Amino acid sequence: MPKSLYIDPVKVREPGYIHFEDIPVCQYNKTIKQELEEGNYTKEDLIRIYRDMAICREFEHMLTLIKTQANYNGVETTYPGPGHLSYGQEASCVGEAYLLNKDDITFGSHRSHSEILSKGLSCINKLSDEELMQTMESFLGGKTLAAVKKFADTSDVKELAIRFLLYGTVAEIFARENGFHHGMGGSMHAFFLPFGIYPNNAIVGGSAPIATGAALYQKNNDKKGVVVCNIGDASLGCGPVYEAMNFSAMDQFKTLWEEGRKGGLPIIFNVFDNFYGMGGQTMGETMAYNMPARLGAGITPSQMHAERVDGWNPLAVIDAYKRKMELIKNNEGPVLLDVVTYLSLIHI
């Protein structure tokens, strides 16, 4: 109990009202032409965004065909493991990752294949050829890279890095020793730390408290980067998620911490609102919030800077991240982003 914080019994009983601000809902409305004219993107940037989404979709399509037909592009094989796919969520993941670099940390949701690939592709675009080669050559003693070079006929380092990312992820999912973690993590626990990609989680909402701990570590140690906690809309029915949000925004960060270090934790709670949790539809059936962004009003007076954005438009997601990351840099975290997408395929 801090003696420096006085609770005035008269003041806390004064009559009044608790006020709320409007929470923005899908306010982004720029066209591609406008974005190009304003110089926010080049044509090459937009093509790369589309390419990254296409890679994520084809990756999940590959797993689906192998699981259901034991064949992909004429290659016969099987996959007996779990498949929690992110069909339909590609734009949300690519938009999230676009501005992130290797110093930014992401923790995965229940459906993290596209999150992993998007973050990896974003890092590959930003890192130099020298940095990429050093990463690939040093990871697992170069074992994964050696396997990739057997079939990757290219002198383009970034193209080689993309194949390295895809191969390492596939090998991990298929429990192969050349996977990013010798196949011991699999689909539900794949990660690649050199790119700031931390584990996803088989427990619904499980990333929330872990990511919050990482954000506390970042703040305590003056580390660069934002922590992104990816969770689904159904996870908002889990107590640890609320505990994590509250912890990340505790008043003591603003009232008791020393000057220069005050402010909430550098974390963005990214809710992929795909409207389902297993067989339950969150909107209109299993949840009461209607829109996940509403919950920010129950955590902090700033409403966690909550916003609902169109997750089927990667440019809308990028626009939101640009603004929210600026808040984090100014020690105004945490942030709640409600990213509207859709679950096209449940499990395979």
Where are these regions (language model features)?
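N-terminal amphipathic, basic-rich helices that act as targeting or association modules
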Residues: 2-123
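Generic recognition of stable, solvent-exposed alpha-helical segments in well-folded globular domains
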Residues: 45-48, 54, 58, 91, ...
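Cofactor-binding active-site loop characterized by glycine-rich and histidine/acidic residues
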Residues: 65, 74-267, 277-304
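Nucleic-acid-processing active sites and adjacent nucleic-acid-binding tracks
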Residues: 272-275
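Conserved phosphate-handling catalytic cores of large alpha/beta enzymes
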Residues: 277, 284, 303-332
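Mobile "lid/hinge" segments at catalytic clefts and subdomain interfaces of large enzymes
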Residues: 342-344
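Conserved small/polar residues in nucleotide/adenosyl-binding loops
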Residues: 346-348
